[in-house]
């Protein structure tokens, strides 16, 4: 059996709020909005050296080398989505939740696994709409950088 590849990473989990409800009532407009949001989110993740590992419809799992980079990406993309929603008048105004956690992960092919991924997803599900919820370990790591975020 081959050795499992592990490394420390910051995991960002995000999900679109009430996506199923939107898609049920306005399928094509919701898909258009989702595509517009992804055109905002994906480049921001890349800008802060993140890599998208998994997407499932309206959710994204990305990993970053740095908790500061992950947090900056989350802050910037939430602000950009809010700005988009201020000017959007045809399609649904989609909102997102974000959870960020730092932990050891398992890398297998093009995917990541581990308890850290699950914790980031749980934080995302508990995050207020349009906000970011970070774990205590992330808070400890970015504490001195908070002034600049």
Model region roles, listed by residue range:
Residues 39, 61-147:
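Catalytic beta-strand-to-alpha-helix segment of the class III nucleotidyl cyclase homology domain
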Residues 1-73, 79-80:
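Catalytic NTP-binding/metal-coordinating core of nucleotidyl cyclase/transferase enzymes
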């Amino acid at each position: 059996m081959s050795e499992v590849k592990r490394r420390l990473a910051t995991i960002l989990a995000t999900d679109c709020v009430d996506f199923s409800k939107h898609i049920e009532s306005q399928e094509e407009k919701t898909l258009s909005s989702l595509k517009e949001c992804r055109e905002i989110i994906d480049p921001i993740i890349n800008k802060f050296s993140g890599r998208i590992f998994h997407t499932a419809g309206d959710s994204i799992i990305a990993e970053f080398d740095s908790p500061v980079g992950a947090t900056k990406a989350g802050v910037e993309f939430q602000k950009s989505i809010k700005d988009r929603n201020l000017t959007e008048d045809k399609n649904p105004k989609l909102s997102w939740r974000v959870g960020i956690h730092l932990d050891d992960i398992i890398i297998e092919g093009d995917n990541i696994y581990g308890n850290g991924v699950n914790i980031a997803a749980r934080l995302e599900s508990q995050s207020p709409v349009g906000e970011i919820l970070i774990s205590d370990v992330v808070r400890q790591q970015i504490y001195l950088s908070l002034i600049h975020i």
